[in-house]
Amino acid sequence: MCTDIRLVRLTDRHISGRTLDFGYDVQSRVQVVPRGQRQSAVTTNTAAQTMTWSNDLGYVGMDAFGFEWAICDGLNEAGLSIGTLWLPETTLPTSPPTDSGPGVIDFVHLAGWILGTCRTVDDVRTALASVRIWNAPIKRLWQSTDPLPKNL
């Protein structure tokens, strides 16, 4: 389970941090993602509309296990920060939607999409209302194909 901390000073400066409690090296790397970078979500279902986007905002973030664009924590040029935390109680669909409704994004790419397209928390709320999120299994984390229990 991960822990998130936030220190707020009287001068309105915020410091955030987190633990990444896996008990082994998650091979994090710093990713610098420029404006205009084209990205896409992962889906295994051709009926669902797979999301693709071009970043309006550049951002810097930490990835894990060598998954390119799979951001665990990051900060964009508008000052919006995000952290994905390991919370076993989190439940998301474990397969992508099969209909042709709104865009579908896997949780692995969600943080990067938010950082690349949203300037404020209100933007995030609006954006999240326009997508369906699913929890793609990530076998690289453990031998099981269980999905990754994460939370924003």
Language-model region placement:
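Accessory structured domains or lobes within enzymes
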Residues: 1, 8, 118-152
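Alpha/propeptide regions of enzymes that mature by internal proteolysis
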Residues: 84, 88, 100-132
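A contiguous strand-loop segment
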Residues: 1-102, 136-139
